[in-house]
């Protein structure tokens, strides 16, 4: 298969490694990738786990209200006398029987709609919640329940709270999660049906990954044969190298699918944030902006000096290099600053990152890994980064400008609403670009 990149044009400092990298790129992209293998249709769950949990909660609603009602029937009289008074001689002002029927109504409607017919719309639960809320408000205003016993408070309040919990769970968990799973599945199918394009120039470093010294790629088969530079020796080091290459392959795929990027928002400086669904990794955020400086300057500031980034990048509070595996691969430890006005607390990350130089771009790609020197710390929630990175593209017409791309796929863990995470990530990316521009201006002033 012919290569889409002419590596003979690369600078003389990296010819051998560049040629190895070209062969690796062809091989890795011509074979099925684990990130783009769709689930066979026969193996897809017809009933999602989150929907099954919702149906179980609806059943709990009915059983819990029934149990409370039975307890209420046994408080003052025998259960049979109480049943006769509340059912046969039903009175709206004094009977709890209608609250039990309300629970039965919710159970039947929700189980039929979301278990039997597997609806993917909120209209059924909107009806049940509206009916429940209206009935309970009328019941509380017009009835004499509060003069009887504690159950005059317990049953209406419990029924009201459980009904709204069901609404929240369906709207924010079931429907959202199933829609995301469906998008991921369709993206996987589309990726499997289309031939993987060969990647051209690959740029810079990763969203939460601050990168290693200047070097290029090598073939894994040649790890033990290279005679120059640092090389991976142990099995763990070779595993780090493999992870770095996997992340690099995914970032390359993302770069070739720019026409599929979904525009999200922009700022006054023209920076734009896009999103793309990545099979088995979910939503990936992509920041793209133009910088008034050379690509080499960004390469030096963002990729080659990660420890110094904390001096000018306020979105990061800690950045340490835990291990330099080889000339292209390193393991880093990063702590992000809080976001969304403190709602999102600081997270720490352990990432493996791979850096490669190309004729017209620089790339640093990485993903989450584990390292013995940084176990989980009780002070931070340990986040997990999917494949992502920084990319710096040189301009063929004007060497004094460059295009900067940040690919960010991260799971912040914790119990945070997904919409809040997405908003905070986009804001953090714009903030990073602001700090980067300020740093570039400071460097330009110091050079004068």
Curated annotation (Swiss-Prot):
Belongs to the STARD3 family. It comes from the Eukaryota. Sterol-binding protein that mediates cholesterol transport from the endoplasmic reticulum to endosomes. The sterol transport mechanism is triggered by phosphorylation of FFAT motif that leads to membrane tethering between the endoplasmic reticulum and late endosomes. Acts as a lipid transfer protein that redirects sterol to the endosome at the expense of the cell membrane and favors membrane formation inside endosomes. GO terms for molecular function: cholesterol binding; cholesterol transfer activity; protein homodimerization activity. This is StAR-related lipid transfer protein 3. Keywords: Endosome, Lipid transport, Lipid-binding, Membrane, Phosphoprotein, Transmembrane, Transmembrane helix, Transport. Homodimer. It comes from Danio rerio (Zebrafish). The chain crosses the membrane at residues 53-73, 96-116, 122-142, 150-170. The keyword Membrane applies. It is found in: Late endosome membrane. Its main location: membrane. A motif (FFAT) lies at residues 208-214. Residues 232-445 form the START domain. GO terms for cellular component: endoplasmic reticulum-endosome membrane contact site; late endosome membrane; organelle membrane contact site. It catalyses: cholesterol(in) = cholesterol(out). Phosphorylated. Phosphorylation allows the tethering of two membranes that participates in the formation of ER-endosome contacts. Phosphorylation of FFAT motif drives membrane tethering between the endoplasmic reticulum and late endosomes that in turn allows the efficient transport of sterol mediated by the START domain. The START domain mediates lipid-transfer between membranes. It contains a hydrophobic cavity able to accommodate one lipid molecule, thereby serving as a 'hydrophobic bridge' across the aqueous gap between donor and acceptor organelle membranes. The MENTAL domain anchors the protein in endosome membranes and exposes the START domain in the cytosol. It is a multi-pass membrane protein. Signal peptide: none annotated. Residues 47-219 form the MENTAL domain. Pfam families: MENTAL, START. GO terms for biological process: cholesterol transport; vesicle tethering to endoplasmic reticulum.
């Amino acid at each position: 298969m012919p290569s889409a990149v002419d590596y003979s044009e690369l600078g003389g400092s990296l010819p051998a490694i560049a040629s190895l990298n070209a062969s690796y790129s062809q091989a890795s992209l011509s074979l099925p990738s684990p990130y783009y293998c769709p689930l066979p249709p026969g193996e897809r769950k017809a009933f999602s786990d989150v929907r099954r949990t919702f149906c179980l909660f609806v059943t709990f609603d009915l059983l819990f209200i029934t149990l409370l009602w039975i307890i209420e029937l046994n408080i003052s009289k025998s259960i049979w006398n109480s049943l006769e008074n509340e059912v046969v001689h039903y009175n709206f002002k004094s009977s709890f029987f209608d609250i039990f029927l309300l629970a039965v109504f919710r159970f039947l409607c929700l189980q039929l709609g979301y278990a039997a017919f597997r609806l993917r719309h909120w209209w059924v639960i909107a009806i049940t919640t509206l009916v429940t809320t209206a009935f309970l408000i009328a019941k509380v205003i017009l009835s004499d329940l509060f003069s009887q016993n504690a159950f005059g408070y317990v049953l209406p309040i419990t029924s009201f709270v459980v009904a709204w919990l069901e609404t929240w769970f369906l709207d924010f968990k079931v429907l959202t999660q199933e829609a995301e799973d469906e998008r991921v599945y369709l993206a996987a199918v589309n990726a499997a049906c289309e031939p993987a394009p060969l990647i051209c120039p690959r740029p810079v470093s990763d969203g939460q990954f601050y990168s290693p010294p200047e070097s290029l790629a090598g073939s894994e088969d040649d790890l033990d044969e290279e005679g120059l530079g640092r090389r991976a020796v142990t099995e763990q080091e070779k595993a780090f190298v493999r992870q770095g290459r996997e992340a690099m392959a995914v970032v390359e795929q993302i770069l070739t699918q720019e026409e599929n990027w979904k525009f999200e928002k922009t700022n006054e400086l023209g920076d734009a944030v896009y999103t793309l669904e990545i099979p088995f990794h979910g939503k990936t955020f992509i920041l793209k902006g133009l910088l008034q400086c050379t690509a080499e300057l960004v390469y030096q500031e963002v990729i080659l000096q990660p420890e110094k980034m904390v001096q000018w990048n306020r979105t990061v509070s800690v950045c340490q290099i835990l291990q330099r595996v080889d000339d292209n691969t390193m393991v880093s430890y990063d702590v992000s600053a809080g976001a969304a006005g403190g709602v999102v607390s600081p997270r720490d990350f352990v990432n493996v990152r791979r850096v490669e130089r190309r004729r017209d771009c620089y790339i640093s790609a990485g993903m989450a890994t584990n390292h013995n020197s940084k176990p989980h710390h009780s002070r931070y929630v340990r986040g997990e980064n999917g494949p992502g990175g920084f990319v710096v593209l040189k301009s063929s017409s004007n060497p004094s400008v460059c295009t900067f791309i940040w690919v960010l796929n991260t799971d912040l863990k914790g119990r945070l609403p997904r919409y809040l995470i997405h908003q905070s990530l986009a804001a953090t990316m714009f903030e990073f670009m602001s700090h980067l521009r300020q740093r570039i201006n400071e460097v330009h002033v110091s050079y004068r």
